[in-house]
Amino acid sequence: MKALHFGAGNIGRGFIGKLLADAGIQLTFADVNQVVLDALNARHSYQVHVVGENEQVDTVSGVNAVSSIGDDVVDLIAHVDLITTAVGPVVLERIAPAIAKGLVKRKAQGVDAPLNIIACENMVRGTTQLKGHVMNALADGDKAWVEQHVGFVDSAVDRIVPPSASATNDPLEVTVETFSEWIVDKTQFKGALPNIPGMELTDNLMAFVERKLFTLNTGHAITAYLGKLAGHQTIRDAILDEGIRAVVKGAMEESGAVLIKRYGFDADKHAAYIQKILGRFENPYLKDDVERVGRQPLRKLSAGDRLIKPLLGTLEYGLPHVNLVKGIAAAMHFRSDEDPQAQELAALITEKGPQAALAQISGLDANSDVVAEAVNAYNATK
């Protein structure tokens, strides 16, 4: 089996690429970073530090790399069996034209073997969004062939992969936590279902997408925003602060009540899942910076993302949300010289005030009780 993976960054190398290579799949990375491409093609291997209770170093071998903006990547798309991505939500649109060209070439060469594409991004139904971008880049005459022969498979991914401390010395070395979860929608595949250790197949993906978004992502973001306000450097420092921990755990319990109501998750098992996530945040081997985790606050405060979406669920079911609101207020306070969205957020609040700014960013009604609650919490944490 041959696979092409877009995105040779930390998540690409430390998570999805590693699982594919470990499964014996012939793997080629596609990226724009020439330093990483050259290193991969010189060595065809790299090291992954897996950190947790038992630290180990795994070697991923037998890999190649191509530029994601050259002809080689188009040629590969015509022949591989699987395409995966870990490029970040914003970059999906940028790789779509190359994928479209490769699919046209595949059709022209008469390659009718099924191809499956899986976007492994921190977003809801990322592959469906990628499919939209690919279809927009195709001529009408090619769309029916693509619908017939190409599966666009949505997935939920979960593994904390912070920037590697040794990245200055070795561009390929990466550190990851022990925990990983890759859940894919088995109803969307074309052809036989793949057997890849570490890839879980489900016919109820949205339950797992929202479980991860409402728990890991919600908790991670709130830990970062409260941690930044309190002057903590890392997620571990922040979650060991009892005041922050109480709000984060409370927010995950509030979002969890929505999941239990919506999808019928077992309450005891979900409580254990929350505890496991708190333990992951405490991992002393992960130097996870609050500034990194908090970046892009406008996206994280948007209607379908990790703060507002669970809040909307609490409103839908008439459930408490006091800790989620505290997290939203902390997000509104996020400031970073390194992050354009943080600067845009600050400018918007200065220009319009917190009430109108939050309504504009989140889509919540400016005159609603919940916006008033968030503004009160925002003002209380100044």
UniProtKB/Swiss-Prot annotation:
Coiled coil: none annotated. Pfam families: Mannitol_dh, Mannitol_dh_C. NAD(+) binds at A3, L4, H5, F6, G7, A8, G9, N10, I11, G12, R13, G14. It catalyses: D-mannitol 1-phosphate + NAD(+) = beta-D-fructose 6-phosphate + NADH + H(+). It is an enzyme of class 1 (oxidoreductase). Keywords: NAD, Oxidoreductase. Its EC number is 1.1.1.17. GO terms for molecular function: mannitol-1-phosphate 5-dehydrogenase activity. Gene3D superfamilies: N-(1-d-carboxylethyl)-l-norvaline Dehydrogenase, domain 2, NAD(P)-binding Rossmann-like Domain. One of its GO terms (cellular component) is cytosol. GO terms for biological process: mannitol catabolic process. InterPro entries: 6-PGluconate_DH-like_C_sf, 6PGD_dom2, Mannitol_1_phos_5_DH, Mannitol_DH, Mannitol_DH_C, Mannitol_DH_CS, Mannitol_DH_N, NAD(P)-bd_dom_sf. It comes from the Bacteria. SUPFAM superfamilies: 6-phosphogluconate dehydrogenase C-terminal domain-like, NAD(P)-binding Rossmann-fold domains. Belongs to the mannitol dehydrogenase family. This is Mannitol-1-phosphate 5-dehydrogenase. It comes from Salmonella typhi.
